A protein has these predicted regions:
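Extracytoplasmic "Venus flytrap"/periplasmic binding protein-like
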Residues: 1-57, 90-95, 99-102, 196-197, ...
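Hinge/lid segment of periplasmic solute-binding proteins
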Residues: 29-82, 108, 217-219, 301-304
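Extracytoplasmic/periplasmic substrate-binding proteins
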Residues: 29-31, 136, 167-253
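Short, solvent-exposed loop/beta-turn-alpha elements that line the ligand-binding surface or hinge
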Residues: 42-58, 123, 143-164, 210-211, ...
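Extracytoplasmic/periplasmic solute-binding protein
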Residues: 69-78, 83, 93, 105-154, ...
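Glycine-centered hinge/linker elements that transmit conformational signals in sensory
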Residues: 111-112, 151-180
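Periplasmic-binding protein-like
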Residues: 255-279
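C-terminal capping/gating helix-and-loop segments adjacent to ligand/active sites or protein-protein/ligand interfaces
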Residues: 296-346
Protein backbone atom coordinates (compact mmCIF):
# COMPACT_ATOMS: atom_id res chain seq x y z
CA UNK A 1 0.00 0.00 0.00
CA UNK A 2 2.59 2.58 1.10
CA UNK A 3 4.99 1.55 -1.64
CA UNK A 4 2.27 2.36 -4.19
CA UNK A 5 1.58 5.72 -2.54
CA UNK A 6 5.30 6.52 -2.66
CA UNK A 7 5.49 5.65 -6.35
CA UNK A 8 2.40 7.79 -7.07
CA UNK A 9 3.99 10.70 -5.21
CA UNK A 10 7.17 10.28 -7.24
CA UNK A 11 5.17 10.48 -10.47
CA UNK A 12 3.18 13.52 -9.31
CA UNK A 13 6.30 15.46 -8.31
CA UNK A 14 8.04 14.54 -11.56
CA UNK A 15 5.11 16.04 -13.49
CA UNK A 16 5.19 19.22 -11.39
CA UNK A 17 1.85 18.50 -9.66
CA UNK A 18 2.91 18.55 -6.04
CA UNK A 19 0.19 17.40 -3.62
CA UNK A 20 0.00 19.63 -0.56
CA UNK A 21 -0.43 16.93 2.12
CA UNK A 22 0.61 13.30 1.73
CA UNK A 23 0.36 10.21 3.94
CA UNK A 24 3.73 8.43 3.91
CA UNK A 25 4.48 5.03 5.43
CA UNK A 26 7.11 5.06 8.18
CA UNK A 27 9.28 2.53 6.36
CA UNK A 28 9.74 5.02 3.51
CA UNK A 29 10.91 7.87 5.76
CA UNK A 30 14.54 7.83 4.65
CA UNK A 31 13.68 7.24 1.01
CA UNK A 32 11.21 10.15 0.96
CA UNK A 33 13.54 12.49 2.84
CA UNK A 34 16.44 11.77 0.49
CA UNK A 35 14.54 11.73 -2.81
CA UNK A 36 11.73 14.31 -2.42
CA UNK A 37 11.90 17.99 -1.47
CA UNK A 38 9.41 18.30 1.38
CA UNK A 39 8.62 21.12 3.81
CA UNK A 40 10.27 21.12 7.25
CA UNK A 41 7.24 21.08 9.53
CA UNK A 42 8.92 22.90 12.42
CA UNK A 43 9.61 25.79 10.05
CA UNK A 44 6.16 25.58 8.46
CA UNK A 45 4.25 25.78 11.75
CA UNK A 46 6.49 28.62 12.93
CA UNK A 47 5.71 30.59 9.78
CA UNK A 48 1.99 29.82 10.15
CA UNK A 49 1.95 31.48 13.58
CA UNK A 50 1.95 28.37 15.80
CA UNK A 51 5.63 27.57 16.47
CA UNK A 52 4.93 25.33 19.48
CA UNK A 53 2.21 23.14 17.95
CA UNK A 54 4.44 20.10 17.57
CA UNK A 55 6.25 20.15 20.91
CA UNK A 56 3.10 21.07 22.87
CA UNK A 57 0.97 18.26 21.45
CA UNK A 58 3.29 15.33 20.70
CA UNK A 59 5.72 13.37 22.84
CA UNK A 60 9.37 13.47 21.70
CA UNK A 61 9.49 9.73 20.94
CA UNK A 62 6.38 10.10 18.76
CA UNK A 63 7.85 13.03 16.82
CA UNK A 64 11.01 10.97 16.26
CA UNK A 65 8.98 8.49 14.20
CA UNK A 66 8.92 11.11 11.41
CA UNK A 67 12.40 12.56 11.87
CA UNK A 68 15.53 11.86 9.88
CA UNK A 69 18.69 10.85 11.72
CA UNK A 70 19.89 14.46 11.71
CA UNK A 71 16.68 15.56 13.45
CA UNK A 72 14.82 17.12 10.53
CA UNK A 73 11.05 16.96 11.08
CA UNK A 74 10.03 15.82 7.60
CA UNK A 75 6.55 14.80 8.71
CA UNK A 76 4.12 14.46 11.59
CA UNK A 77 2.90 11.04 12.82
CA UNK A 78 -0.79 10.60 12.03
CA UNK A 79 -1.67 6.92 12.30
CA UNK A 80 0.11 4.53 14.65
CA UNK A 81 -0.33 0.80 14.69
CA UNK A 82 1.34 -2.09 16.45
CA UNK A 83 1.21 -5.78 15.54
CA UNK A 84 -1.02 -7.88 17.78
CA UNK A 85 -2.23 -11.47 17.87
CA UNK A 86 -5.92 -11.86 17.02
CA UNK A 87 -7.46 -15.18 17.99
CA UNK A 88 -10.78 -16.98 17.73
CA UNK A 89 -11.96 -18.00 21.24
CA UNK A 90 -14.42 -20.51 19.81
CA UNK A 91 -11.66 -22.39 17.98
CA UNK A 92 -9.51 -22.18 21.10
CA UNK A 93 -12.29 -23.75 23.17
CA UNK A 94 -12.80 -26.54 20.64
CA UNK A 95 -9.06 -27.24 20.75
CA UNK A 96 -8.99 -27.27 24.55
CA UNK A 97 -6.98 -24.04 24.79
CA UNK A 98 -7.96 -21.78 27.67
CA UNK A 99 -5.77 -18.70 27.24
CA UNK A 100 -3.85 -16.81 24.58
CA UNK A 101 -0.24 -17.81 23.88
CA UNK A 102 2.41 -15.59 25.45
CA UNK A 103 5.50 -16.84 23.60
CA UNK A 104 6.30 -17.81 20.03
CA UNK A 105 7.00 -21.36 21.18
CA UNK A 106 3.43 -21.47 22.50
CA UNK A 107 2.10 -20.00 19.23
CA UNK A 108 3.71 -22.88 17.35
CA UNK A 109 2.33 -25.46 19.81
CA UNK A 110 -1.14 -23.89 19.75
CA UNK A 111 -1.19 -23.84 15.94
CA UNK A 112 -0.43 -27.57 15.79
CA UNK A 113 -3.03 -28.32 18.49
CA UNK A 114 -5.69 -26.35 16.61
CA UNK A 115 -4.91 -28.16 13.37
CA UNK A 116 -4.88 -31.61 14.98
CA UNK A 117 -8.00 -31.19 17.13
CA UNK A 118 -10.27 -29.03 14.95
CA UNK A 119 -8.99 -29.40 11.40
CA UNK A 120 -8.73 -25.61 11.10
CA UNK A 121 -5.54 -23.79 10.22
CA UNK A 122 -3.64 -22.60 13.27
CA UNK A 123 -1.71 -19.45 12.38
CA UNK A 124 -1.21 -16.76 9.73
CA UNK A 125 1.10 -13.75 9.79
CA UNK A 126 0.22 -10.87 7.50
CA UNK A 127 1.98 -10.82 4.11
CA UNK A 128 1.72 -7.23 2.97
CA UNK A 129 4.27 -5.84 0.53
CA UNK A 130 6.42 -4.64 3.42
CA UNK A 131 8.55 -6.04 6.24
CA UNK A 132 6.76 -4.53 9.23
CA UNK A 133 5.58 -7.73 10.93
CA UNK A 134 8.84 -9.48 10.08
CA UNK A 135 10.82 -6.68 11.75
CA UNK A 136 8.82 -7.21 14.94
CA UNK A 137 9.53 -10.93 15.12
CA UNK A 138 13.22 -10.51 14.17
CA UNK A 139 13.90 -7.75 16.69
CA UNK A 140 11.86 -9.43 19.43
CA UNK A 141 14.29 -12.34 19.07
CA UNK A 142 17.27 -10.02 19.55
CA UNK A 143 18.06 -9.40 15.89
CA UNK A 144 18.07 -6.20 13.86
CA UNK A 145 16.80 -5.26 10.42
CA UNK A 146 19.49 -2.70 9.61
CA UNK A 147 22.83 -1.81 11.16
CA UNK A 148 25.56 0.79 10.64
CA UNK A 149 29.08 -0.27 9.73
CA UNK A 150 31.65 2.53 9.47
CA UNK A 151 28.82 5.03 9.11
CA UNK A 152 27.11 3.12 6.30
CA UNK A 153 23.72 1.42 6.60
CA UNK A 154 23.83 -2.32 5.93
CA UNK A 155 21.46 -5.27 6.20
CA UNK A 156 21.38 -6.67 9.71
CA UNK A 157 19.03 -9.58 9.16
CA UNK A 158 21.63 -12.22 8.21
CA UNK A 159 21.93 -13.47 11.80
CA UNK A 160 20.94 -16.60 13.73
CA UNK A 161 18.26 -14.59 15.56
CA UNK A 162 16.59 -13.46 12.34
CA UNK A 163 16.88 -16.92 10.80
CA UNK A 164 15.30 -18.54 13.85
CA UNK A 165 12.36 -16.12 13.69
CA UNK A 166 11.74 -16.72 9.99
CA UNK A 167 12.26 -20.47 10.28
CA UNK A 168 9.62 -20.69 13.02
CA UNK A 169 7.07 -19.31 10.55
CA UNK A 170 8.26 -21.63 7.79
CA UNK A 171 8.12 -24.69 10.04
CA UNK A 172 4.45 -24.02 10.84
CA UNK A 173 3.69 -23.81 7.13
CA UNK A 174 5.63 -27.02 6.51
CA UNK A 175 3.75 -29.03 9.16
CA UNK A 176 0.39 -27.78 7.87
CA UNK A 177 -0.57 -25.69 10.90
CA UNK A 178 0.56 -22.37 9.42
CA UNK A 179 -0.85 -20.58 6.40
CA UNK A 180 1.28 -19.02 3.64
CA UNK A 181 -1.22 -17.06 1.55
CA UNK A 182 -2.33 -13.64 0.43
CA UNK A 183 -3.66 -11.28 3.08
CA UNK A 184 -7.13 -11.57 1.59
CA UNK A 185 -7.06 -15.36 1.93
CA UNK A 186 -5.55 -15.30 5.42
CA UNK A 187 -7.85 -12.64 6.83
CA UNK A 188 -10.91 -14.24 5.27
CA UNK A 189 -9.98 -17.61 6.77
CA UNK A 190 -9.87 -15.95 10.20
CA UNK A 191 -13.09 -13.99 9.78
CA UNK A 192 -15.00 -17.04 8.53
CA UNK A 193 -13.95 -19.13 11.54
CA UNK A 194 -11.45 -21.38 9.77
CA UNK A 195 -8.23 -19.99 11.29
CA UNK A 196 -7.28 -19.85 14.95
CA UNK A 197 -4.75 -17.00 15.08
CA UNK A 198 -3.62 -14.15 12.86
CA UNK A 199 -0.78 -11.75 13.58
CA UNK A 200 -1.41 -8.37 11.99
CA UNK A 201 -1.96 -4.69 12.69
CA UNK A 202 -4.29 -3.32 15.35
CA UNK A 203 -5.43 -1.19 12.41
CA UNK A 204 -7.55 -4.19 11.38
CA UNK A 205 -9.43 -4.20 14.69
CA UNK A 206 -12.48 -2.18 13.64
CA UNK A 207 -12.99 -4.21 10.47
CA UNK A 208 -12.42 -7.55 12.19
CA UNK A 209 -14.79 -6.78 15.06
CA UNK A 210 -17.49 -5.71 12.61
CA UNK A 211 -17.06 -8.58 10.14
CA UNK A 212 -16.13 -11.70 12.13
CA UNK A 213 -18.70 -14.42 12.87
CA UNK A 214 -17.36 -14.75 16.44
CA UNK A 215 -16.14 -12.45 19.25
CA UNK A 216 -12.72 -11.16 18.17
CA UNK A 217 -10.05 -11.35 20.86
CA UNK A 218 -6.66 -9.62 20.84
CA UNK A 219 -3.53 -10.74 22.68
CA UNK A 220 -0.25 -8.91 22.97
CA UNK A 221 2.56 -9.60 20.49
CA UNK A 222 4.23 -12.81 21.71
CA UNK A 223 7.75 -12.85 23.10
CA UNK A 224 10.71 -15.12 22.58
CA UNK A 225 11.17 -16.47 26.08
CA UNK A 226 13.38 -14.20 28.18
CA UNK A 227 13.74 -11.53 25.49
CA UNK A 228 12.03 -8.10 25.39
CA UNK A 229 9.31 -7.52 22.80
CA UNK A 230 10.19 -4.86 20.21
CA UNK A 231 7.51 -3.89 17.70
CA UNK A 232 7.88 -1.36 14.91
CA UNK A 233 5.41 1.51 14.94
CA UNK A 234 3.38 1.07 11.78
CA UNK A 235 0.95 3.37 10.06
CA UNK A 236 1.82 6.66 8.46
CA UNK A 237 2.90 10.25 8.89
CA UNK A 238 1.88 13.44 7.11
CA UNK A 239 4.26 15.30 4.78
CA UNK A 240 3.80 18.69 3.13
CA UNK A 241 4.91 19.43 -0.43
CA UNK A 242 3.23 22.81 -1.02
CA UNK A 243 5.04 25.09 -3.46
CA UNK A 244 3.87 28.49 -2.17
CA UNK A 245 3.45 30.15 1.22
CA UNK A 246 -0.35 30.38 1.14
CA UNK A 247 -0.79 26.67 0.38
CA UNK A 248 1.83 25.77 2.97
CA UNK A 249 -0.07 27.70 5.64
CA UNK A 250 -3.35 26.06 4.56
CA UNK A 251 -1.65 22.65 4.74
CA UNK A 252 -0.63 23.37 8.34
CA UNK A 253 -4.22 24.30 9.23
CA UNK A 254 -5.51 21.13 7.59
CA UNK A 255 -3.01 19.03 9.56
CA UNK A 256 -4.12 20.75 12.79
CA UNK A 257 -7.70 19.77 11.98
CA UNK A 258 -6.70 16.15 11.25
CA UNK A 259 -4.87 16.08 14.59
CA UNK A 260 -7.75 17.54 16.63
CA UNK A 261 -9.24 15.26 19.33
CA UNK A 262 -12.59 15.08 17.51
CA UNK A 263 -11.05 14.20 14.14
CA UNK A 264 -8.62 11.68 15.61
CA UNK A 265 -11.33 9.73 17.41
CA UNK A 266 -13.31 9.50 14.16
CA UNK A 267 -10.21 8.31 12.32
CA UNK A 268 -9.36 5.76 15.02
CA UNK A 269 -12.95 4.52 15.22
CA UNK A 270 -13.12 3.96 11.49
CA UNK A 271 -9.65 2.50 10.97
CA UNK A 272 -8.54 0.95 14.24
CA UNK A 273 -5.31 2.97 14.27
CA UNK A 274 -4.02 4.43 17.53
CA UNK A 275 -3.90 8.25 17.82
CA UNK A 276 -0.44 9.90 18.02
CA UNK A 277 -1.37 13.08 19.87
CA UNK A 278 -0.44 13.50 23.53
CA UNK A 279 -3.30 13.02 25.98
CA UNK A 280 -5.88 11.81 23.46
CA UNK A 281 -6.30 8.46 25.23
CA UNK A 282 -7.35 10.37 28.38
CA UNK A 283 -9.35 13.12 26.64
CA UNK A 284 -13.15 12.82 27.18
CA UNK A 285 -13.62 14.37 23.72
CA UNK A 286 -11.09 12.01 22.25
CA UNK A 287 -10.17 8.37 22.71
CA UNK A 288 -10.87 7.82 26.42
CA UNK A 289 -14.39 6.31 26.30
CA UNK A 290 -13.55 4.13 23.32
CA UNK A 291 -10.39 2.77 24.96
CA UNK A 292 -12.12 2.10 28.28
CA UNK A 293 -14.86 0.07 26.60
CA UNK A 294 -12.70 -2.04 24.29
CA UNK A 295 -10.18 -4.50 25.77
CA UNK A 296 -8.63 -5.08 22.35
CA UNK A 297 -7.62 -1.40 22.19
CA UNK A 298 -6.21 -1.63 25.71
CA UNK A 299 -3.92 -4.48 24.62
CA UNK A 300 -2.61 -2.39 21.72
CA UNK A 301 -2.04 0.65 23.92
CA UNK A 302 0.00 -1.51 26.31
CA UNK A 303 2.43 -2.22 23.45
CA UNK A 304 3.15 1.45 22.72
CA UNK A 305 6.12 1.66 25.16
CA UNK A 306 7.69 -1.27 23.26
CA UNK A 307 7.37 0.44 19.86
CA UNK A 308 10.49 1.31 17.87
CA UNK A 309 11.06 3.02 14.53
CA UNK A 310 10.14 1.05 11.45
CA UNK A 311 13.39 0.22 9.65
CA UNK A 312 13.71 2.42 6.58
CA UNK A 313 16.05 1.48 3.73
CA UNK A 314 17.97 4.60 2.63
CA UNK A 315 19.20 5.83 -0.72
CA UNK A 316 17.92 5.82 -4.27
CA UNK A 317 17.77 2.01 -4.21
CA UNK A 318 15.78 1.86 -0.98
CA UNK A 319 12.57 0.61 -2.59
CA UNK A 320 14.44 -2.12 -4.44
CA UNK A 321 16.20 -3.22 -1.26
CA UNK A 322 12.89 -3.36 0.59
CA UNK A 323 11.42 -5.53 -2.18
CA UNK A 324 14.30 -8.01 -1.92
CA UNK A 325 13.46 -8.72 1.70
CA UNK A 326 9.78 -9.07 0.81
CA UNK A 327 10.69 -11.56 -1.91
CA UNK A 328 12.87 -13.69 0.37
CA UNK A 329 9.97 -14.03 2.78
CA UNK A 330 8.15 -16.01 0.09
CA UNK A 331 11.26 -18.10 -0.61
CA UNK A 332 11.51 -19.06 3.07
CA UNK A 333 7.81 -19.65 3.75
CA UNK A 334 7.43 -21.77 0.62
CA UNK A 335 10.27 -24.00 1.84
CA UNK A 336 12.41 -23.27 -1.21
CA UNK A 337 15.43 -22.50 0.99
CA UNK A 338 16.21 -22.60 4.72
CA UNK A 339 15.90 -19.21 6.39
CA UNK A 340 19.59 -18.87 7.29
CA UNK A 341 20.75 -19.50 3.71
CA UNK A 342 18.12 -17.29 2.08
CA UNK A 343 18.66 -14.36 4.45
CA UNK A 344 22.44 -14.48 4.04
CA UNK A 345 22.11 -14.37 0.23
CA UNK A 346 19.59 -11.52 0.37
CA UNK A 347 21.66 -9.48 2.81
CA UNK A 348 24.60 -9.57 0.40
CA UNK A 349 22.39 -8.36 -2.47
CA UNK A 350 20.91 -5.59 -0.31
CA UNK A 351 24.35 -4.43 0.82
CA UNK A 352 25.52 -4.25 -2.79
CA UNK A 353 22.54 -1.97 -3.52
CA UNK A 354 22.92 0.25 -0.47
Amino acid sequence: MYKGLTQNLQAAIASGKNPDVVQMGYSFLNYAAENFQSVNLNDAFAKSGDPNFLKDNFLPNVLELAQTEDGKQVGLPYSISVPVLYYNPEIFKAAGLTEAPKTWAEVKTYAKTIKDKTGNMGFFMQEYADNWAQQAIIESNGGVMLKKVNGKVQAGFDTPEAAEAFQLMADMVKDGSGLHATNEEGFQAYLSGKLGMVCTTIGKRANFEKTAKFPVKVATFPEFEGKPVRVAAGGNFLMVFSKDAAKEKAACEFIKYLQSPEALVKWSTGTGYLPPRKGIAEDPKGFKKMAEENKNIQVALSLMPKAVKWASFPGANGLQAEQMLIDVRDVILSGEKPAAEALKETAKKVNDLL
